Amino acid sequence: MKNAWMLPLLAALAGCATPTAAPVLGTRPSYLESVTADVPNGAALRHRIWTPALDEGYVPQGLTSAGAHLFVSSYKPTPDLKANTGPCRVFRIEIASGTIAGHFDIPPGTCTHSGGMAYLGQGKLFLADTRALFLIDVDKALASGTSAGASKSIKITGELRGSYATFDGKDPWIGTWTKEQPKARMFRLDQRLFDEFDGQTVRENRAAESIPVPLEAQGAAFDKAGNLWVSASNGQWGKLYRLDRQGAVKAAYDMVAGLEDLTVDEAGRLWGLSESGTRKYLHWPTRFPHIFQIDPARLK
């Protein structure tokens, strides 16, 4: 009992202790002992969720939101992890818990990378693959586990490339990942293309508009104020840009390597994800296979 006097002091110190970081939601991969703790602007990356099906080898690419859920499009490198293409799968994830709440596959051979997604409202999901675009009835696809019989599609050629996708509230957009400045552009499309050209091929002359974007762009999202956020990355670095509606860069921030697609949810919150730390990219110096909310006010 001689140390009983210490109990109130210890209780007081415990109350003043710095709170631990919030746990990462979702399913932690079995192969990853730790993640990179110090990533650029890490203080702005909140509500972290493990990207889906990491143990199965899926590489996350596209990201969009609908109500209480996020949707992630991924591909499974095939025949092995050296491949940059493979079967595509779309996962639905509960924002609050990080739990996978269903998934569906894109028919084999029709999608190989699933670079970007955008939710267009009324149950319609827009998915961009390198040379194909899909308009998917989400409820039907989730119910059957496949988008077969639940989608329309068009092939794209010429300057059109489905490296990523977004939605401005009226029209879907697609953009090109490239290291060549003249080719670094986003294109605004009309949803009616899926009615007029379902199963056919279109090129850039069918785009309603195009604007320039930064090099090596991986994702894009319009916020409620009309800003266009664009992500760019490779295995060594990541960038987050804020552009105006005409494509002029207004701000740039360092971000986690492997930063892929972006989305803005119904509450106006900006989200992103990184493909670093997936089985395919374990040789990268960064391991951060998370979906995360980005707080613009904390970016430096």
Predicted regions and their residues:
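Beta-strand-rich domains and repeat architectures in extracellular enzymes and scaffolds
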Residues: 48-86
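Repeated scaffold domains used in trafficking and secretory/extracellular systems
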Residues: 57-62, 111-116, 157-167, 214-219, ...
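Loop/turn-rich, solvent-exposed surfaces of beta-rich toroidal or solenoidal domains
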Residues: 207-243
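A short helix->beta-strand "capping" segment at the edge of beta-propeller domains
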Residues: 31-56, 203-205
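Conserved beta-propeller blade signature
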Residues: 70-72, 124-127, 172-175, 228-230, ...
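Structural motif
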Residues: 81-89, 132-138, 181-190, 236-241, ...
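Surface loop/turn motifs at the tips and blade-to-blade linkers of beta-strand repeat domains
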Residues: 51-55, 104-110, 153-158, 208-214, ...
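Residue-level detector of Asp-centered blade-edge/turn motifs that repeat once per structural unit
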Residues: 65-67, 119-122, 167-169, 222-225, ...
